[in-house]
């Protein structure tokens, strides 16, 4: 196995060497790929084969990402009027794919993530015996520089708490409370939107919330912050009512606008590529901070505001 790994190492660009690459080489050594007559050689058809092959390991969120990449590939294939075969995924393909995506105004980060998925499909195809191009392992798109992630400071949160009640509809008040809860609990929207008073227990005089994270399956015990307890007291011990992710994102932008969280902030947001055509892409720029607020800001705000003050284990 040492000779096999070293031989493979000497034949690829060292920038592609990572844990995934090593695991693939080990798999190849112990389970040499054989020709699989059932596996399609066309890339788009192979995506469906890949989904079926890994159906017991793939989460709904991952499946959603795969379908998005598949739709992008379908549009790309239609634009070039030529079927994409796995064996043709090489440097020329990569450049053509990048140029197409840029023309369609996709952000570089989106292009890079889509290409990582394309390589994943092709490497899996290689594993089951489908012919791939010798350039495959060396193909990469450089990740864009990370932009500073926005979060709500304690000053921002105080502004949100102090919004005049007569400015808020019931829906906005509900979203405002969820936003505060998320910023003081640090949980994902898929988890905090499922919070209920039945999940609360008391231990040594402290109120603790127990739940299972939807994404990870981990059992969590979270002490309830005084700001969360204030909201529960206001609502007779109940959490705000559940709303959809989309409505929550829309409402908290409005809440932060009412709180005058307007400082110019670098970031990206979805904008229509051309008025009236209904196609949206993420566009980077400088915007008012409230325009960049999304559901993940609660988790990010908690992590930033409480870093070093609350134990992480």
Where are the predicted features?
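Short, aromatic/basic-rich helix-turn unit that serves as a nucleic-acid recognition element
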Residues: 3-14, 34, 41-70, 128-129
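N-terminal core-binding DNA-recognition domain of tyrosine recombinases/integrases
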Residues: 48-61, 70-148, 163-168
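Short amphipathic helical patch at the helix-1/turn junction of helix-turn-helix
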Residues: 102, 182-183, 307-308
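Basic, Lys/Arg- and aromatic-enriched nucleic-acid-binding interface segment
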Residues: 108, 112-114, 131-189, 215, ...
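Short, charged phosphate-coordinating catalytic segments
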Residues: 123-133, 182-205
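Short, basic (Lys/Arg/His-rich) helix/loop patches that form interaction surfaces
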Residues: 167-169, 238-239, 253-312
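Conserved tyrosine-mediated DNA breakage-rejoining catalytic core shared by Y-recombinases
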Residues: 194-233
């Amino acid at each position: 196995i040492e000779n096999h790994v070293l031989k493979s190492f000497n034949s690829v660009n060292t920038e592609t060497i990572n844990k995934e690459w090593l695991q693939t080489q080990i798999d190849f050594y112990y389970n040499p790929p054989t020709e699989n007559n059932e596996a399609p050689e066309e890339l788009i058809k192979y995506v469906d084969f890949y989904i079926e092959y890994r159906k017991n390991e793939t989460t709904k969120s991952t499946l959603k990402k795969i379908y998005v990449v598949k739709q992008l590939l379908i549009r790309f294939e239609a634009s070039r009027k030529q079927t994409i075969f796995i064996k043709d995924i090489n440097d020329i393909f990569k450049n053509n794919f990048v140029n197409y995506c840029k023309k369609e105004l996709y952000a570089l980060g989106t292009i890079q993530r889509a290409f990582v998925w394309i390589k994943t499909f092709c490497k899996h195809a290689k594993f089951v015996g489908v012919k791939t191009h010798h350039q495959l392992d060396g193909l990469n798109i450089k990740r864009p520089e990370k932009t500073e992630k926005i979060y709500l400071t304690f000053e921002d949160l105080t502004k949100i708490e102090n919004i005049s009640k007569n400015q808020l509809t019931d829906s906005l008040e509900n979203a405002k409370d969820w936003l505060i809860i998320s910023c003081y609990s640090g949980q994902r929207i898929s988890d905090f939107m499922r919070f209920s008073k039945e999940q609360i227990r008391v231990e040594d005089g402290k109120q603790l919330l127990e739940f299972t994270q939807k994404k990870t399956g981990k059992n969590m015990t979270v002490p309830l912050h005084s700001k969360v307890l204030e909201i529960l007291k206001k609502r007779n011990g109940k959490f705000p009512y559940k709303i959809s992710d989309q409505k929550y994102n829309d409402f908290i932008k409005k809440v932060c606008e009412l709180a005058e969280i307007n400082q110019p902030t670098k970031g990206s947001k979805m904008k229509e590529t051309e008025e009236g055509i209904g196609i949206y892409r993420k566009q980077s720029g400088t915007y008012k901070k409230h325009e960049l607020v999304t559901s993940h800001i609660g988790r990010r705000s908690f992590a930033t505001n409480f870093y070093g003050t609350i134990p992480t284990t």
